[in-house]
Swiss-Prot record:
This is UPF0102 protein TW312. It comes from Tropheryma whipplei (strain TW08/27). Belongs to the UPF0102 family. NCBIfam families: PRK12497.2-4. One of its GO terms (molecular function) is nucleic acid binding. Pfam families: UPF0102 (PF02021). InterPro entries: Restrct_endonuc-II-like, tRNA_endonuc-like_dom_sf, UPF0102_YraN-like. It comes from the Bacteria.
Length: 120
């Protein structure tokens, strides 16, 4: 991984790695980069009947650090966006188990992926 990769490209690569990781671990990716006027969800996936909004955080170093950038305000927004996604897809939030996870992807010294299940 070169050091001149743009922040956008790094984020896109991190999301690709996160999707692959989730798929290998039994998740079905339902949507990526879902956007509405209020914001964006990186990944929406399903496993064992649970709909999961996954926030992907990428960085060059230390897989624990990027996760620290998810604030209480961001968690509230992710919850709102997940409910908006459910509404758009005609799914009833009261009949489905929901969860918010985070996946941290770092590249230096080597690729490291950490999945934080149920951050909210």
């Amino acid at each position: 991984m070169t050091h001149d990769v743009s922040k956008y490209a790094l984020g896109r690569i991190a999301e690709d790695k996160a999707c692959n990781y989730l798929s290998v671990n039994g998740y079905i990716v339902l949507d990526r980069n879902w956007y509405c006027r209020f914001g964006e969800l990186d990944i929406i996936a399903r496993k064992n009947g649970v709909i999961v909004a996954v926030e992907v955080k990428g960085g060059k170093r230390n897989a624990d650090y990027p996760i620290c950038n998810i604030t209480v305000k961001k968690l509230s927004k992710l919850t709102f966006l997940l409910k908006a996604w459910l509404h758009e897809n005609k799914l009833n939030e009261f009949c489905i188990d929901l969860r918010i996870d985070a996946v941290s992807v770092t590249f230096i010294p080597e690729l490291q992926i950490r999945h934080f299940v149920g951050i909210l």
